[in-house]
């Protein structure tokens, strides 16, 4: 088979549909196709020709291949999905900018991109597939947006360069083997929203400390799996046993510094305590809630954080 025309009624092309069709040189895909899964054209002359034209191969809004990219890459605005395996074993990739038009990232999209050091996932992304960053040994920082509701199986397995991760409170589950063999991981902040964690999610993370609230699922999980747990108190950054103006100052200082690109000066546990609204980041909203909380307590109103956040 040297050429193929996809009929107009087709809306999706499945995983590995034309994998290793070694004679395929021409293909016509109609606009009706809105979903293209992983490895669809891998090992075809057609894909090789497209890679020579542009290392980012995009079809109908889906980035299907970037495996020949090197250095820092910017995905163009308008791309809505990154297909499974799009950057599979792309060892020359060092950085990538993902536009807010992207809503999904497929299985193994960045599998074994060993030179990738940092990635920020925009809050437009609502789903990430299994193995999405598996084997990214050079990855030292990952920002997970609060649009994500689950961390998939094997998502960050063998990311040995990761040391700290904060899970946003939009997430309800962490998949099996999600951080397995990420041997450098020492701190992970898990919010109360997480009620399911795979039994092997943190296998071989021998120096890991799970941070969370007392009585949370995270605490129960840590104890059942022999992982050290550290509780943090909402808003109490200096561990004084109360939330006061000192905690507000530390939070404002952090927000101001981060806004101009400087280090915030807070530890992982302090950041977790400062994130009073559980958004996964510390910002001016947290400062407002802390000031409101302190003001109410200052006039004798013994309100809880739940009551403050409900305002």
Segments (PLM) and residue ranges:
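Structural signature of tandem-repeat unit edges
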Residues: 1-12, 21-35, 44-60, 67-81, ...
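Consensus positions within tandem repeat domains that build extended binding/scaffold surfaces
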Residues: 14-19, 38-40, 84-88, 106-111, ...
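Extracellular adhesion/carbohydrate-binding repeat motifs centered on closely spaced tryptophans
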Residues: 16, 46, 50-69, 108, ...
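Extracellular interaction modules
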Residues: 35, 218-226, 279-284
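A recurrent domain-boundary module in secreted/ectodomain proteins
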Residues: 44, 217-232, 303-311
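Gram-positive cell-envelope targeting signals
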Residues: 61, 133, 147, 156, ...
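Extracytoplasmic/secreted cell-surface and envelope-processing proteins
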Residues: 197-199, 219-220, 299
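Cellulosome-associated attachment modules in secreted, modular CAZymes
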Residues: 232-311
